[in-house]
Curated annotation (Swiss-Prot):
<feature type="region of interest" description="Disordered">
    <location>
        <begin position="350"/>
        <end position="388"/>
    </location>
</feature>
<feature type="signal peptide">
    <location>
        <begin position="1"/>
        <end position="18"/>
    </location>
</feature>
<feature type="glycosylation site" description="N-linked (GlcNAc...) asparagine">
    <location>
        <position position="290"/>
    </location>
</feature>
<comment type="subunit">
    <text>Component of a complex composed of at least SWP1 and SWP2.</text>
</comment>
<comment type="function">
    <text>Spore wall component.</text>
</comment>
<protein>
    <recommendedName>
        <fullName>Spore wall protein 1</fullName>
    </recommendedName>
</protein>
<keyword id="KW-0749">Sporulation</keyword>
<dbReference type="GO" id="GO:0030435">
    <property type="term" value="P:sporulation resulting in formation of a cellular spore"/>
</dbReference>
<keyword id="KW-0325">Glycoprotein</keyword>
<keyword id="KW-0732">Signal</keyword>
<feature type="compositionally biased region" description="Acidic residues">
    <location>
        <begin position="373"/>
        <end position="388"/>
    </location>
</feature>
């Protein structure tokens, strides 16, 4: 009976341990009282129970302290065999902690895509900038030449200030006196004043008309891009618009000459009494001659201005054509050098392929094969890693 009771007690003790093992860390060192009070084992097993519970408490305490220094995933892997736990946990912890590698003050390394930009993207961008600067410089020169031409035309127009010399009125007055006409003493001065006034008015009219046309053209060209300016020059529109400055000048000169004649005739009409027909003929012939001289004078002056402007326009077009031709030649050489530099950088074998013969081709094939093998190995590694 004693043996049977002992076996039953041992079986009960084993069952209790099986049910309570997950919560063994809660057992105090004096847990043997629980078994003693329930008369499960007897006093001779108290020391063994105390030893088991104390060891379990130490193990669980050690497990909790170690889990606080690693990730939760690492603590779950702790029940694996030692080597498997060490390999998987260390790699997992490395992957977990790698996300925090940029939190320190040290700068993170650039991504691979950015580091590889220096091979292709950066050289192309720099080449594009150099080409842009080359062509932009040409466009600026072209535009500045046209603007300078128009500015010089404005300067010539502003300097257009011819002074009509006027007629010889003293001779006319002497002739009238011989015909018995009493002429006021200030008649010659009054006629000369009319000449000066009409001359000045005509000069201002010519200047105002020309300045308006050229100033408007200068304002429009200043706001244009190169292609529009080039089209304006090559189509002949620039030349026609500049020439339009002089299209309406001749009618203005003619009208002003007629006004001059009418105003000077009015001076003699103020003379009291009836003038003899010979005096009227002398006055008419003298004033008509003065009008003709006035029109001829200003026609010549404006023609000289027009010729000067036309010569400047011809010089401008010639210089622009020369600039375009020279720049095109220089740009072709410049662009070829830039492209050659890029080709030798990206395709270094192509520069030596003519001299290398078949060896160059085989070398390229070998490199490609190696690259292909590397890519396949990389794929296998990723597949294995994913399976694991």
């Amino acid at each position: 009976m004693i043996k049977l009771s002992l076996l039953l007690s041992l079986a009960s003790f084993t069952a209790v341990l099986a049910n309570q093992r997950p919560r063994c860390q809660r057992c105090p060192v004096s847990s043997s009282k629980y078994f003693q009070q329930n008369n499960l084992l007897g006093s001779r097993f108290q020391n063994e129970v105390q030893r088991l519970c104390a060891r379990r408490v130490r193990e669980e305490s050690s497990s909790e302290s170690s889990s606080s220094s690693s990730s939760e995933d690492c603590s779950r892997r702790r029940r694996r065999p030692h080597r498997e736990w060490e390999d998987s946990c260390s790699s997992s912890y490395s992957s977990c902690s790698s996300t925090d590698s940029c939190s320190s003050s040290a700068p993170c390394p650039p991504p691979v895509a950015q580091r590889c930009d220096i091979e292709l993207k950066t050289p192309i961008i720099l080449m594009g900038e150099r080409i842009y600067e080359f062509l932009k410089n040409y466009e600026d020169q072209y535009k500045k030449a046209v603007l300078l031409f128009l500015t010089n035309i404005l300067s010539q127009i502003s300097g257009f200030n011819p002074v009509f010399p006027g007629g010889d009125y003293d001779a006319l007055i002497e002739q009238l006196k011989t015909l018995g006409v009493t002429v006021p003493a200030n008649t010659a001065a009054e006629l000369a004043a009319i000449d000066a006034a009409e001359s000045s008015a005509l000069t201002r009219a010519i200047q105002a008309n020309a300045q308006k046309v050229i100033s408007d053209l200068l304002t429009r060209v200043s706001a244009m891009c190169y292609l529009d300016i080039m089209s304006l020059v090559n189509s002949g529109l620039l030349a026609s618009q500049v020439s339009s400055v002089f299209n309406n000048i001749q009618p203005i000169i003619t009208i002003t000459g007629n006004d001059l004649f009418a105003k000077q005739m009015a001076v003699f009409q103020k003379i009291p009494g009836t003038l003899p027909s010979a005096a009227i003929t002398a006055i008419t012939n003298a004033l008509q001659g003065n009008r003709t001289n006035f029109v001829t004078f200003f026609t010549t002056q404006t023609s000289n201005l027009q010729t000067s402007v036309q010569n400047s326009l011809t010089t401008l077009i010639s210089e622009l054509e020369k600039l375009a031709t020279d720049t095109e030649t220089a740009f072709t050489a410049f662009a070829n050098a830039e492209i050659s530099a890029l080709i030798s950088r990206i395709f270094p074998t192509s520069t030596t392929s003519s001299g290398s013969g078949d060896s160059t081709g085989s070398g390229s094939t070998g490199d490609a094969g190696d690259a292909g093998d590397t890519g396949e190995d990389g794929g296998d590694d990723e597949g294995t890693e994913g399976t694991g």
